[in-house]
Amino acid sequence: MTFISKTQHADVVLIGGGIMSATLGAFIKQLEPTWTISLFERLDEAGLESSGPWNNAGTGHAALCELNYSPAAKDGSVDPSKALHINEQFQLSRQFWSHLVDSNVIGSPKGFINTVPHMSFVIGDDHSNFLKNRYEALKPNTLFRSMEYTEDQDQIAKWAPLIVKGRDRKQRVAATRAAEGTDVDFGALTRELTGYLQSSGAEVNYGHDVTNIHRAAGGGWDLSIKHPKSGEHGRIHAKFVFVGAGGGALHLLQASGIPESKGYGGFPVSGQFFRCTDDAITSQHSAKVYGQASVGAPPMSVPHLDTRYVDGKRSLLFGPYAGFSTNFLKTSSYLDLPLSIRPGNIIPMLAVAKDNMDLTAYLIKEVAKRHEAKVEALREYYPEAAGGNWELITAGQRVQIIKKHPQKGGVLQFGTEVIASRDGSIGALLGASPGASTAVPIMIELLQKSFPKNFKGWQSKLKDMMPGYGVKLNENPDLAAELEASTARSLQLEVANAIQG
């Protein structure tokens, strides 16, 4: 499509064609079908940046295997609260996706989600003791009842043969397994959702770059848009704007001038993965196996050996190997980081630089790591790995949040944060992990912040779409079991044995 051809006015403008914008658009179409929506994506297709299947690990993050969501306290104890919160969030995502499948809004769920057990795997006494403590903290909870624990290498070999084959039998190892884990192709899901938006009357514009945004005199927002291929420029007015442009969100949020954007900065972290598509190898592994991060490593750098399903083909992914680039998007400019510096965020950014020297040292070490050293890291999880069977691919950028802190000046925040103007006319999402897996609860939070009056009237519809909405499933075992079974049927997933019946 060439430059904006249908409208210069919209009730809602979505900036960015990733999973967040697509999810928000789907919610709005379900809740307010008469509202007009225009989506603008700078690339030629939806879901090509961080939502793309090879730009993220594709883990349906439910805290079943990610050890950084339940770290050990100084006394060795494990607090399960954050893991429970993330799992509750993922249950909402499952319910919304199930509703869309059951309503024939999107196609076969096999195109975007598949059952892949989630495992944690650790080596050595200290890590094994921690994993056992974690298991004992999580197992009594409804949402983790299916979890199994073992230190028996023969049992681990039944779950994931590659991580045991060739390993020293005297080495102490430990593993947990949750059979209900999932692998998600967020690129495919994003394209299903944007397809739904188009078929229901929304205008979806690819190859359109939103270059500026400012308040309109009569209310709402005026957006400047460029069509790079034709060189055309144009404008569109919106009553509400969502800046869901991934790493590109910070620049546009700063351009809006809203007070709520002051003091935020971004710290980009890049990553690489090894990918294997050899059927003789991929057929021997059906799990997402997460380990422990190195000292000083950011949370998104936890090593893991994953089964992936992309375009119906099974493959293996190992990594990530962290790196550093000043780009905020995989396809953007090296000037992104320096151009994001403002008088209001320079102190937080300098404070973060001073207080995170271990992270800086880790990134320098990772960038300097040679190919053979990367293969050796792979062999910690797959002892018999041959480097020639694996290709190195570059993943998407993760822009972590830098924000003001009253005592420290600034802190580096791992996670996501919804930012909305006081009048609710513009909202944005900053940050990363767990990100896409929790797109549904994140966008519900944004709807609540941006449309507080409408939100009260949406409660019944939200409950219809997601029967567990507003309920802590961990405290309602019968409803949790019912919804696990019903969403598994809708999404064609397996049900964890421990929760059946």
Swiss-Prot record:
Top EC class, one word: oxidoreductase
GO molecular function, one term: 2-hydroxyglutarate dehydrogenase activity
Coiled-coil features, chain-numbered ranges: none
Flavoprotein listed as a keyword: yes
InterPro entries linked to this entry: FAD/NAD-bd_sf, MQO
Entry keyword annotation includes Nucleotide-binding: no
GO biological process, one term: tricarboxylic acid cycle
Pathways per UniProt: Carbohydrate metabolism; tricarboxylic acid cycle; oxaloacetate from (S)-malate (quinone route): step 1/1
Pfam families referenced in this protein's UniProt entry, alphabetically: Mqo (PF06039)
Keyword tags: FAD, Flavoprotein, Oxidoreductase, Tricarboxylic acid cycle
EC number: 1.1.5.4
Catalysed reactions listed for this entry: (S)-malate + a quinone = a quinol + oxaloacetate
Requisite cofactors: FAD
NCBIfam families in alphabetical order: mal_quin_oxido (TIGR01320), PRK05257.1-1 (NF003603), PRK05257.1-4 (NF003605), PRK05257.2-1 (NF003606), PRK05257.2-5 (NF003609), PRK05257.3-1 (NF003610), PRK05257.3-2 (NF003611), PRK13339.1 (NF009875)
Family note: Belongs to the MQO family.
Name under which the protein is recorded: Probable malate:quinone oxidoreductase
Species in which this protein is naturally found: Paenarthrobacter aurescens (strain TC1)
Lineage: Bacteria, Bacillati, Actinomycetota, Actinomycetes, Micrococcales
